From Swiss-Prot:
Source organism: Yersinia pestis
UniProt GO BP: L-methionine salvage from methylthioadenosine; L-methionine salvage from S-adenosylmethionine; purine deoxyribonucleoside catabolic process
Function, as annotated: Catalyzes the irreversible cleavage of the glycosidic bond in both 5'-methylthioadenosine (MTA) and S-adenosylhomocysteine (SAH/AdoHcy) to adenine and the corresponding thioribose, 5'-methylthioribose and S-ribosylhomocysteine, respectively. Also cleaves 5'-deoxyadenosine, a toxic by-product of radical S-adenosylmethionine (SAM) enzymes, into 5-deoxyribose and adenine. Thus, is required for in vivo function of the radical SAM enzymes biotin synthase and lipoic acid synthase, that are inhibited by 5'-deoxyadenosine accumulation.
UniProt-recorded name of the protein: 5'-methylthioadenosine/S-adenosylhomocysteine nucleosidase
Catalysed reactions listed for this entry: S-adenosyl-L-homocysteine + H2O = S-(5-deoxy-D-ribos-5-yl)-L-homocysteine + adenine; S-methyl-5'-thioadenosine + H2O = 5-(methylsulfanyl)-D-ribose + adenine; 5'-deoxyadenosine + H2O = 5-deoxy-D-ribose + adenine
Enzyme nomenclature, EC number: 3.2.2.9
Length: 233
């Protein structure tokens, strides 16, 4: 088994990359892919860069060059579910774009033409993540994660997203693009991110302060998931 792991930023991948054994690096078009073994599993760790285009391009490179059996998207997110606090975990049941709008042609908010309304995470990977959450005794929410090319900060964009997607649990900038590419490649995926900020008017300050906390928590989750997969054989 080979596991693809995707993080957008240096802070989101460095703790994992530094632990990869027999590490090799592929650099292409602004992306970096690190291959080797981590916690007993063959891995391909992608640092994609920020935003939907970077995430889609990087995920495509990852799937084409490394052919992982599954993909886990790690990193940070802004919490919209009222029960989420900094350091808590959000697990995707599905991902959607919050900044796509072709509703004039009968599509749902966030739905791209010719695509499903949402990209649905793999149930087995969701169960794996939730099992690890219980083992680690972390607070977590399973729900909708919405992505767009904007850092959500302030009442107006928050209200717009909540109005269009009432069940949204968290927002960030890559997960829907990753889910979109995995859907096209028929590769199972799940998003497991830690909360770095509660999306509000001061979220940019919280993000800068707590990104490292979120990175440590999401790394803890990835390592636990890999260990469980290795034990299953």
């Amino acid at each position: 088994m080979k596991v693809g792991i995707i993080g957008a930023m240096e802070e989101e991948v460095t703790l994992l990359r530094d632990r990869i054994e027999n590490r090799q690096t592929l650099a292409r078009a602004g992306c970096e892919i690190y291959t080797g073994q981590l916690n007993g599993i063959d891995v391909a760790l992608l640092k994609s860069g920020i935003g939907k285009v970077a995430a889609a391009m990087g995920t495509t490179l990852l799937l084409e060059h490394c052919q992982p059996d599954l993909v886990i998207n790690t990193g940070s997110a802004g919490g919209l579910d009222s029960s989420l606090k900094v350091g808590d975990i959000v697990v995707s049941n599905e991902v959607r774009y919050h900044d796509a709008d072709v509703t004039a042609f009968g599509y749902e908010p966030g739905q791209m033409a010719g695509c499903p309304a949402a990209f649905v995470a793999d149930e087995d990977l969701i169960a794996l993540a939730e099992n690890c959450i219980q083992q680690l005794k972390l607070n977590a929410v399973r729900g909708l994660i919405c992505s767009g090319d904007a850092f959500i900060n302030g009442a107006e964009p928050l209200a717009r997203i909540r109005a269009a997607f009432p069940t949204v649990a968290a927002v960030e900038m890559e997960a829907a693009a990753i889910g979109h590419v995995c859907y096209l490649f028929n590769t199972p995926f799940v998003v497991v991110r830690a909360i770095s900020d509660v999306a509000d008017q001061a979220s940019h300050l919280s993000f800068e302060e707590f990104l490292v906390v979120a990175a440590k928590q999401s790394t803890l989750m990835i390592k636990a998931m890999l260990t469980t997969l290795a034990q299953r054989g």
